[in-house]
Amino acid sequence: MRTAVASPAALDSGRQEPLRVMVVDDSVVIRGLISRWIEAEPDMVVAASLRTGLDAVNQVERANPDVVVLDIEMPELDGISALPQLLAKKRNLIVIMASTLTRRNAEISFKALSLGAADYIPKPESTREIAAADIFKHDLIQKIRHLAAKRRRPAALASAREPEPRPIQATPVPAHSAPVLRPFSTHAPRALLIGSSTGGPQALMTLVAGIGPVIDRYPVLITQHMPPTFTTILAEHLARAAGRPAHEGVDEEIVKPGHIYLATGGRHMRLARKGTGAVIVLDDGPAVNFCKPAVDPLFTSAIDVWQGGILAVILTGMGSDGMRGGQQIVAAGGNVIAQDEASSVVWGMPGAAAQAGICAAVLPLQQIAPKLVRLFAGDHS
């Protein structure tokens, strides 16, 4: 294994040096596996491979990682206890929490996000699962790469996060050409659909807290890329944030105003017409866009129910899930709003929609909820 030596001038040179990744896990098997995956990537290097959170805290300054993959359950010092100490010792450190799919670990992962962790990833529970963990490998490498890319951009992006009131308009996109916006369709919205991935849990809680008047009168359906158990916990958090009922969608459940429906982990949430309304259909088919649940199945299936009466929001996340479904929503007469780059943890999904020219608005997260309230009240200005 090539373990990197810290280079303080890494970003001052003419080229960017490989991403430095610290792997912290008490399982030697998982540590070795993740380390080998990282070493196989041309743009990454293992900064350190450590057994406990205490080791990580003691060595983080010397190892100088860009990213830490941090297990939750470890001896001496567990991940949730090590997290604030690591962030205090290294500014802008990206920490990805790794845990098995238990309710306790899901709760801890959500707490870690509130304490400053950048993301989480579900970890295979046995060595037999690990040996064939292609999805785990794919997701981990992509998370490391995309989260680090955002942090490595000029600090000018950070200034755009300030929540000062600004006119409702498309936000300048620093690293891409400005998206071409469509005029808002005048179809009256009848349902709100939301898709999100990396950074989504925090963004969703901010969003639902500000759209109470919308939830009271219209159904809200959300697909967040997330595994089983985690979606159960997320629904509970969304209910508290919104002050309205929120739960995982149930097969053949009738969709009603006043409720938030969340796609359950491991199954796509689709919609089907029933009379004048809609029912939820849980789909155990193949992953779409490498995801299950995926956003596109929700978006496309909703058209059969509400046609042009759909308002879709695409929040922070990796990849392009939601873009194709958004295209079909727009073609049916609906509207799409995307989160802007500056306020996104990763501007993959919303960026794909914005660059495809299907958005009527590209907005900072803090401006999306007020805009939705106005749109559902009939104000399309």
From Swiss-Prot:
Positions of post-translational 4-aspartylphosphate modification: 71
Catalytic residues identified in the record: 197, 225, 321
Source species taxonomy: Bacteria, Pseudomonadati, Pseudomonadota, Alphaproteobacteria, Hyphomicrobiales
InterPro entries xrefs: CheB-like, CheB_C, CheY-like_superfamily, Sig_transdc_resp-reg_Me-estase, Sig_transdc_resp-reg_receiver
Name of protein: Protein-glutamate methylesterase/protein-glutamine glutaminase
GO BP terms in the entry: chemotaxis
GO CC annotations, alphabetized: cytoplasm
Pfam family, one: CheB_methylest
Role played: Involved in chemotaxis. Part of a chemotaxis signal transduction system that modulates chemotaxis in response to various stimuli. Catalyzes the demethylation of specific methylglutamate residues introduced into the chemoreceptors (methyl-accepting chemotaxis proteins or MCP) by CheR. Also mediates the irreversible deamidation of specific glutamine residues to glutamic acid.
SUPFAM superfamilies in the cross-refs: CheY-like, Methylesterase CheB, C-terminal domain
Domain called CheB-type methylesterase: residue spans: 183-373
